[in-house]
Amino acid sequence: MKIGVLALQGAFREHLNMLGTLGAEAVEVRKAEELPELSGLIIPGGESTTITKLLDIFGMAEPIKALAKKGMPIWGTCAGMICLAKELPGDISGVKPLGLMDITVRRNAFGRQVNSFEAMLKVKGLDKADFPAVFIRAPLVEKTGKGVEILSKLPDGTIVAVRENNLLAISFHPELSGDNRFHRYFVQMAKTYKA
């Protein structure tokens, strides 16, 4: 089983390191031809405009969509959540999301870099201990479709983690938390996929 981390831009090394703590085979992915050999793909945080443009430039958007439809697990964190969304309200400044998840996501919902924060979250599917979530220029989920499961919310009710079948999206950066439980959760999703 091999888990790929999209390595075109963003926090891919941190995801690779976190997967390494679990003994998972993790690889950097930069070409469309590397995708079919994967059991799962992580789209990391970074700059959503840049990531979606590079997905088009490198011919990866359509193969990722096809693999998602076949059931390959895909996990988007922060900017990766934006990439997976069907709808982005407001000024999307050239972002072309993959449109895979039935969610409406607002970019930079918590403000600029200086407004970054950490929060302890209860997360459905993880053990009872709260998860230390790091929010940096994070998006939020404004609306979910019928098939979308809400995994976590902030105390004010803001949705920050969702799952729709083989697709997982979270607003924050679990790779920066020092806690590998979300990565373990995704590895378990990847184990169920038959390429």
From Swiss-Prot:
Pathway(s) where this gene product acts: Cofactor biosynthesis; pyridoxal 5'-phosphate biosynthesis
EC number(s) given by UniProt: 4.3.3.6, 3.5.1.2
SUPFAM superfamilies per record: Class I glutamine amidotransferase-like (SSF52317)
One of the record's GO molecular function terms: glutaminase activity
UniProt-annotated binding residues for L-glutamine: 46-48, 107, 136-137
GO biological process, one term: glutamine catabolic process
Role: Catalyzes the hydrolysis of glutamine to glutamate and ammonia as part of the biosynthesis of pyridoxal 5'-phosphate. The resulting ammonia molecule is channeled to the active site of PdxS.
Membrane-traversing stretches: none
Known catalytic reactions: aldehydo-D-ribose 5-phosphate + D-glyceraldehyde 3-phosphate + L-glutamine = pyridoxal 5'-phosphate + L-glutamate + phosphate + 3 H2O + H(+); L-glutamine + H2O = L-glutamate + NH4(+)
Catalytic site positions: 78, 173, 175
GO cellular component: cytosol; glutaminase complex
Protein known as: Pyridoxal 5'-phosphate synthase subunit PdxT
Record Pfam families: SNO (PF01174)
Record-stated family: Belongs to the glutaminase PdxT/SNO family.
Gene that this polypeptide is encoded by: pdxT
Quaternary structure and interacting proteins, as annotated: In the presence of PdxS, forms a dodecamer of heterodimers. Only shows activity in the heterodimer.
HAMAP family: PdxT
Assigned keywords, A-Z: Glutamine amidotransferase, Hydrolase, Lyase, Pyridoxal phosphate
